[in-house]
Design a protein with these regions (language model features):
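Conserved N-terminal Rossmann-fold NAD(P)-binding element of oxidoreductases
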Residues: 4-9
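Aromatic pocket-lining residues of Rossmann-like dinucleotide-binding sites
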Residues: 20
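Residues at the starts of beta-strands that form the adenosine-phosphate
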Residues: 3, 26-27, 103-104
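Conserved Rossmann-fold NAD(P)-dependent oxidoreductase catalytic core, especially the SDR/UDP-sugar
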Residues: 91-132, 137, 141
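NAD(P)H-binding glycine-rich loop region in Rossmannoid oxidoreductase-like domains
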Residues: 29, 35-91
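Glycine-rich phosphate/pyrophosphate-binding loop and the adjoining helix
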Residues: 143-169
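N-terminal Rossmann-fold NAD(P) dinucleotide-binding loop
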Residues: 13-14
């Protein structure tokens, strides 16, 4: 199957990692906190220390990845940090992905972050992916039901892998 990268592999990311592994995928998850790496590895995923606010720290994590899941819909930080994360940092990350093996993107477009920032991030993902003909899904599955979110996110990965994503969800 495919190698999936989960950028922002916190609580929901680990649930998704477990589901993707159960579906036969290899999974790599990123965390900014080295103490959280054990939680990622406990679900069977490869842990990588990397910060989406410092895109260069994610370069190694992109190696041999087919689908990237950008799960930053409930990221924390100051309003300025979150605005940069879902705009300039996201744009830099997408630009770096173009020249890699990534051929599908899932962007979490719903969460606790200001909906206007997530909408802008979703528009950026749509524009970059459509320009590059990379399948993408804007994940808008509510976060209150963990099981429903996990199933929706895993199905989004399948859609991106199948190439029939075109921004659905």
């Amino acid at each position: 199957m495919a190698r999936c990268l989960i950028i922002g592999c916190g609580c929901r990311g680990r649930l998704l990692a477990g589901e993707l592994i159960a579906r036969g995928h290899a999974v790599r998850g990123t965390t900014r906190d080295s103490a959280a790496a054990g939680g990622i590895e406990a679900v069977g995923a490869e842990a990588v220390i990397g910060d989406p606010d410092v895109v260069a720290t994610l370069a190694r994590a992109l190696d041999h990845v087919t689908v990237a899941c950008i799960l930053l819909g409930s990221a924390t930080g100051t309003p300025a940090q979150l605005a940069a994360l879902h705009s300039t940092r996201l744009e830099m990350l997408l630009t770096r992905m173009i020249d890699t093996t990534v051929r599908g993107i899932v962007y979490e477009a719903e969460g606790t972050v200001d909906p206007a920032l997530l909408d802008a991030g979703g528009a950026l993902v749509r524009a970059r992916c459509e320009d590059s003909r990379i399948p993408y899904v804007l994940l808008r599955t509510g976060t209150s039901d963990a099981a429903a979110w996990t199933a929706g996110a895993a199905d989004a990965v399948t859609s991106a892998l199948d190439g029939d994503a075109a921004g659905r969800r």
